[in-house]
């Protein structure tokens, strides 16, 4: 390399380093903004769920104290309150349904009824409503279902009530 080429190469390398630093700084600031926004949204959600649960007085107290605090940073607020409360105590997921409700949902099996390249039919698989009907059947029917559905090895050993 000649002197001029070497200079140009070094200049491009410096420019690449500066550009990389700028991009890193932009990404960091973007992540910080996202985290702050998420923290605000979670705090709002916690307050709303507390109000829904009937803890109105606590939520009102939190709202008043938050407006009094103004624009303090999170670390300053944490130092004043003695640390953060458990952030995982508030779930953003909807409440889980009961097993019976989940069983009634539209469910389907992706397993074919007749296995490919086989002349033997596949064993019956229970999903959705059929599973719900089988599991909520009367006690005597569920015993017979358990006997007929017992694994082959268990039937050979005589482990199922026959």
Swiss-Prot record:
Keyword annotations of the record: Gas vesicle
Residue spans of biased composition, Basic and acidic residues class: 22-37, 47-64, 122-142, 151-162
Annotated spans, Disordered: 1-162
Start-end of Polar residues biased regions: 65-74, 81-110
Cellular component, GO annotation: gas vesicle
Compartmental location: Gas vesicle
Induction: Transcribed from early-log phase, decreases as cells enter stationary phase, probably as a long gvpF-gvpM RNA. Highly expressed in 25% salt, poorly expressed in 15% salt, no gas vesicles are formed at 15% salt.
Function: Proteins GvpF to GvpM might be involved in nucleating gas vesicle formation. A minor component of the gas vesicle. Gas vesicles are hollow, gas filled proteinaceous nanostructures found in some microorganisms. They allow positioning of halobacteria at the optimal depth for growth in the poorly aerated, shallow brine pools of their habitat.
Additional remarks: Encoded in a 14-gene locus called mc-vac.
Family: Belongs to the gas vesicle GvpI family.
Subunit structure: GvpF to GvpM interact with each other in vitro, and may form multi-subunit complex(es). Interacts with GvpC and GvpO.
Name of the protein in question: Gas vesicle protein I
Organism: Haloferax mediterranei (strain ATCC 33500 / DSM 1411 / JCM 8866 / NBRC 14739 / NCIMB 2177 / R-4) (Halobacterium mediterranei)
Underlying gene: gvpI
